Each structure stands twice: as C-alpha cells, then as structure tokens.
Amino acid sequence: VLAQLPEAVLEGDDGLRWQPLPTAAPEATASLLECRFAVVDVETTGRRAEQERITEVACVTIERGRITETFASLVNPGMPIPPPITALTGISDELVATAPPFAAIATELRQHLSQAVFVAHHASFDRKFLTAELRRADETFVWTAPTLCTVQLARYLVPGLDNYRLDTVTAHFRISNPARHRASGDALATAQLFLRLLERLIEQDIVAVDAVTALLAKQKRTTRRRPLPGEDRHHE
C-alpha cells in the first residue's frame, strides 16, 4: 500500500540547507543534507530473525527534510502468531490470514529501501529481520546501505531521559503516535523523531553519514550496558 501523507506531515523545515537528491546509492561519506532516508518499523512473531517472521512492515521515506511517502503492509508469516505478540500489537492469525507473504511485497519494499540510508528505532532488530526476509525472497540479495539508529542518536543528542523507548523519546518531542505497536504508526513516529534529531545534528555541524556512524559507534562502546526494564524491542 503506497500512501501520501497529510500536507501537515509532509511539510519540512525550509530553514535547513537541503540539497538536490542524489541519483546513486548513498555512500558513507554522503552529506545528511543530500541523503534519502528509509525509516522502517517491523512487527514480528518473535525476536530471532532466522526462526521468526515479519507480520507487518512500514517504510516512511524522507527526502530533503520532508516525509514524502509511506509504504505499509500486513504480512502473512506462514506460522502462528504467539498470543503475547497479538496482545501487544493487535496483529492476530485472523488479521494476516489474507495478507500477502513477504516474498509478494519484497520487490516493492526494496524500491523504497533503495538509494536510502536505513533508519529505525533499535535499528539492528529491524534490519536483521528485513535482511533475513529479503534473502529468503532472493538468495542473491546484498544490502550495503548505511544504518542510523534513533535510539543511539537520541542517547547522544538528548541525554538524561529516563529511558529511550520510543514512547519516552517521542513524548519528549511532543510527537503523537495513535497507532503504537503497529508498523505504520511506529514508523511514522520514528520518522518524525528522526527529523528532530537530524536538525540537532546539523545544528552541531555533524553533516556526514560516516561522521554520525563513527560518533554512534564510539558512544556505544563507552555506554554499553544491559537494557533497562521495558527497553526490549518487543516491549519498547
């Protein structure tokens, strides 16, 4: 399902120095001002990407500081959805019974991911699941796009919060999410959060993708710890 978002959501900040979009896939040295971003959220049957499956996926595209389009689809995982997952997300076996399998949406989803920096809240979780599903659909698939995690970005740019669950960080920025624990709602909230964090990076003159990834890698090494209660990806 491809959908245009309301005009109020699509409008960007004209005060930022956005540049024309590139035609090639983003390099690590690319400027944040030039990049296309694919902000993604997945809902799944569990935590292990190799054993579990995606039940819903959404991708929000950001170009030149504006949310321009969204893709969202329920996915038939081909396996039962555990009751605790249904209780959390509202996604049941009945809801996905007539949904397409992941392979049926893989090509369209790849179009949204192509030539884009991958962004997600707890990005390693979403990327592992997407990589596993995309490889099942096409065993030759290779994904080299840079990745930015809004959890790590928020820890660096908004220090001192009680935790960095999506609810907590979006509340800090007064971003609403009426569809919590559904891929479309969480992806849109994450995209709006990322735009706020992107503004702060640019204000600090951190404008290269590789500069951001290096900064986050350094921060991760110095702040490595066990997750706080409630920070588990399935209960964030």
Give the predicted meaning of each segment.
Residues 44-46, 152, 189:
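Short, glycine/acidic-enriched loop or turn micro-motifs at the edges of active sites
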Residues 4-15, 23-29, 195-236:
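Acidic two-metal-ion nuclease catalytic site recognized across multiple nuclease folds
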Residues 19-27, 33-144, 159-164, 168-177, ...:
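Conserved non-catalytic scaffold segment of RNase H-like nuclease domains
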Residues 182-195:
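Acidic, divalent-metal-coordinating active-site segment for phosphoryl/phosphodiester hydrolysis
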